Amino acid sequence: MKSPAVPALDLPAEGETGVVDIGPLTLESGAVIDDVSIAVQRWGELSPNRDNVVMVLHALTGDSHVTGPAGPDHPTPGWWDGVAGPGAPIDTDRWCAVSTNVLGGCRGSTGPSSIAPDGRPYGSRFPAVTIRDQVTADLAALEALGITEVAAVVGGSMGGARALEWIVGHPATVRSALILAVGARATADQIGTQSTQVAAIKADPDWCGGDYHDTGRVPSTGLAIARRFAHLTYRGEVELDDRFGNHAQGDESPTDGGRYAVQSYLEYQGAKLVERFDAGTYVTLTDALSSHDVGRGRGGVRAALQGCRVPTIVGGVTSDRLYPLRLQQELAELLPGCTGLDVVDSVYGHDGFLVETEAVGKLIRRTLELAER
């Protein structure tokens, strides 16, 4: 069931999903998407001046459902449960936490699985979007809600890339930022692993050139393989070896056609994603991450970052092998509004920014203190 459209200057009820219609959107490439909708959720009350909004920006396979139980509009519990609420790091007695499903997504916002104006799914006709385009769409949704400035933008991974683009491209609209587990641009390693995941999906015969949505076919095998590969980059090497080692799965014999325990684990992760996520969205957002470069059109990374004065906290995870600490160190050194890199000690790899809620919660609280100054 499609979530109800949110009238201008109105937010959905707390924890519920609404949709903001922002009209046509011109992308960085010059392409135009007609009739764009952005799904939105919020926790906490908007202040009379509409100046207490904390934007919480999700990663690749996330959505607007930051916290709370599963429900009709969100098949899984909140992806950052406990981060927002009364007394939480984003204390909803003071702040209004707002989250959108990103442009190109599949959980209420316009994306490849959405119905185009001609009545058919966009599929392969959905244009390439960039991180910059995603921020443009978020800002348009906020403007439709009568919100012209936010207290903070908070995000990790793709959410961190969005937060970075936000403060560099639109500094007058934000008072502080928390950028976690991301870099200033995509690296060769990231582009390599991400493009390989996309290739796995496109090699699935059920991909149908991206136009599978109204055929009854779904590229489940390709998406599951992509997720298995991605999940390896999300977790820490030591953590995985401690959990699984080279052990067999149950009574299976890997030397006789059986599986290793880690294989079973990755298969499970792939199957879980297939149940809730669209392959076209996975390709669209993965390609957006590969194109991430905050310095594009701004004189390069150094010039772009050094020109940003927004008070910012940058955090990285010790065992992150997808976005290693050197990338956050570069951000911390070049952003004038950052006083140094904050390191989260964790064995959980890239996912540490999601798992280590106590340590990350402290960074969120500090970020919101910056917004109060």
UniProtKB/Swiss-Prot annotation:
UniProt-annotated binding residues for substrate: 227, 351
GO terms of biological process kind: homoserine metabolic process; methionine biosynthetic process
Catalytic activities: L-homoserine + acetyl-CoA = O-acetyl-L-homoserine + CoA
Pathway: Amino-acid biosynthesis; L-methionine biosynthesis via de novo pathway; O-acetyl-L-homoserine from L-homoserine: step 1/1
Record: active site: 157, 320, 350
Any Gene Ontology CC annotation: cytoplasm
Its job: Transfers an acetyl group from acetyl-CoA to L-homoserine, forming acetyl-L-homoserine.
Protein name: Homoserine O-acetyltransferase
Gene symbol of the encoding locus: metXA
